Amino acid sequence: MVALNTLSAVSAALLVLAASPSPASARSLDASPSSAFSGNHSLSKRSLFDPACTGIYDRQLLGKLGRLCDDCYNVFREPKVATGCRSNCYYNLIFLDCLEYLIPSHLQEEHMEALQTVGK
């Protein structure tokens, strides 16, 4: 009986939460998730895109390359790694060193293909 009362209380609490208006539902449908955190400042979809990259804009590939640089920075904690890895559209020695250090050799070709696609 105690378990049933607890279950009923939890169910009632969930119903109240589901029925109450939330700040997220008050946002317009065309608002981006980033605008919720930045106030009136809206981010462009390509705001993190390096204009030096003259290849194909592929958000997924750029994210993969960017995560490699983030991981490398997290390992070494050197500011020059964070900025240098992304410089020249990832076509630099720091990026190659990070690739060699963090990615197993049999998976490095995948990152090099991504570099060729988005790069110079």
UniProtKB/Swiss-Prot annotation:
Which GO terms of the cellular component aspect does the record hold?
A: extracellular region
Could you tell me the Gene Ontology terms of the biological process aspect for this record? Answer: circadian rhythm; glucose metabolic process; neuropeptide signaling pathway
Where is the secretion signal located?
A: 1-26
In Swiss-Prot or TrEMBL terms, this protein is called: Crustacean hyperglycemic hormones 4
Which Pfam family is an annotated match for this chain, by its short name? Crust_neurohorm
Which gene specifies this protein's sequence? CHH4
Where is it localised? Secreted
- What are the recorded GO MF terms, alphabetically? neuropeptide hormone activity
